[in-house]
UniProtKB/Swiss-Prot annotation:
Protein's UniProt name: Cell division protein FtsB
Organism for this UniProt entry: Edwardsiella ictaluri (strain 93-146)
One GO-annotated biological process of the protein: FtsZ-dependent cytokinesis
Classification via NCBIfam families: PRK00888.1 (NF002058)
Domain of life the protein comes from: Bacteria
Key words, A-Z: Cell cycle, Cell division, Cell inner membrane, Cell membrane, Coiled coil, Membrane, Transmembrane, Transmembrane helix
Subunit structure, as described in the record: Part of a complex composed of FtsB, FtsL and FtsQ.
Length: 114
């Protein structure tokens, strides 16, 4: 009985060592699990970006409105005879301190170009 017990204890020790420290043990499993989670998060971000790009491509292929909007926003273009107004936040915002009847007032400046 002593030899069988010793053999089982040694086998149990070897299995525990393999589980915790050995190749493909718990540490490797946790590292790979973290790597998979990181890659899945990265894939989700890239999929979202791809979906946005495909939607933008569809808009650009669909008509002139998307192209016109892009020209206005990114290139600052306007149509002939059109007046462009840009609202600029006021740098001198008035801040009031006191009663609840007083309010914060800030009025945007307006600039126009032809």
């Amino acid at each position: 009985m002593g030899k069988l017990t010793l053999l089982l204890v040694v086998l149990l020790g070897w299995l525990q060592y393999s589980l915790w420290v050995g190749k493909n043990g718990v540490h490797d499993y946790m590292r790979v699990k973290q790597d998979v989670a990181t890659q899945q998060a990265n894939n989700a971000k890239l999929k979202s970006r791809n979906d946005q790009l495909f939607a933008e491509i569809d808009d650009l292929n669909g008509g002139q409105e998307a192209i016109e909007e892009r020209a206005r926003n990114e290139l600052g273009m306007i149509k002939p005879g059109e007046t462009f107004y840009r609202l600029v936040p006021d740098q001198n915002k008035r801040r009031t301190v006191g009663t609840a009847s007083q309010s914060v007032a800030s009025y945007p400046s307006v600039t126009a170009s032809h």
